[in-house]
Curated annotation (Swiss-Prot):
One of its GO terms (molecular function) is metal ion binding. Transmembrane segments: none annotated. Acts as a positive cofactor of GATA transcription factors to establish the identity of the ventral mesoderm during gastrulation. Down-regulation in the dorsal mesoderm is necessary for the proper formation of this territory since, when present, lmo4 may bind ldb1 and restrict the availability of this cofactor for Spemman organizer transcription factors. At neurula stages, suppresses primary neuron differentiation and modulates gene expression at the Isthmic Organizer of the midbrain-hindbrain boundary. SMART domains: LIM. It comes from Xenopus tropicalis. Residues 1-17 have a biased composition (Polar residues). This is LIM domain transcription factor LMO4.1. Residues 22-84, 86-148 form the LIM zinc-binding domain. InterPro entries: LMO_RBTN_TF, Znf_LIM. Signal peptide: none annotated. Pfam families: LIM. PROSITE patterns: LIM_DOMAIN_1, LIM_DOMAIN_2. Keywords: Developmental protein, Differentiation, Gastrulation, LIM domain, Metal-binding, Neurogenesis, Repeat, Transcription, Transcription regulation, Zinc. Residues 1-20 are annotated as: Disordered.
Length: 167
């Protein structure tokens, strides 16, 4: 099964400090170089962490890379291949692939559009919210039926983090 989830990973150049050599996630060889890269919770030779499309060495072109469908991609190739992340469920406008988003019940929102249907306050990562019949409610404005147990929310969420960039 191919994983279609997108992950943005920070690429960090670290010194090997003379410790035991690490194995490269790309070629499997020991990393004896003075500097190595740490990305996606693995160690890499600087020459081995490359974009699957353009073959650019990712440590040389920035500090982040994206993984999707088994590919490791630079930002430009990710945007070229996967374009936008769809339309915002609140405003209907397109969401660029590089923009952070919030999700609820399969719906995608711009960060600025992820607001309570009653008070219109923006909900941020860590806020509790309720998703009822396609509407988002903050903890304070949740429908009264939820308090008495008469209404079943489609989703009543614990604190939520924003999705990784894109998707």
């Amino acid at each position: 099964m191919v994983n279609n989830r997108v992950t943005e990973s920070t690429t960090t150049a670290v010194s090997s400090n003379g410790g035991p050599p690490k194995a490269c996630a790309g070629c499997g060889g020991k990393i004896a170089d003075r500097f190595l890269l740490y990305s996606m919770e693995r160690y890499w030779h600087t020459r081995c962490l490359k974009c699957s499309c353009c073959q650019a060495q990712l440590g040389e072109i920035g500090t982040s890379c994206y993984t999707k469908s088994g590919m490791i991609l630079c930002r430009n190739d990710y945007i070229r291949l996967f374009g936008s992340s769809g339309a915002c469920s609140a405003c209907g406008q397109s969401i660029p692939a590089s923009e952070m988003v919030m999700r609820a019940q399969g719906s995608v929102y711009h960060l600025k559009c992820f607001t309570c249907a009653t008070c219109r306050n923006r909900l941020v990562p860590g806020d509790r919210f309720h998703y009822v019949n396609g509407a988002i409610f903050c903890e304070h404005d949740r429908p009264t039926g939820l308090l008495s147990g008469h209404l079943n929310p489609l989703q009543s969420n614990p604190p939520m983090l924003p999705d990784q960039k894109v998707c």
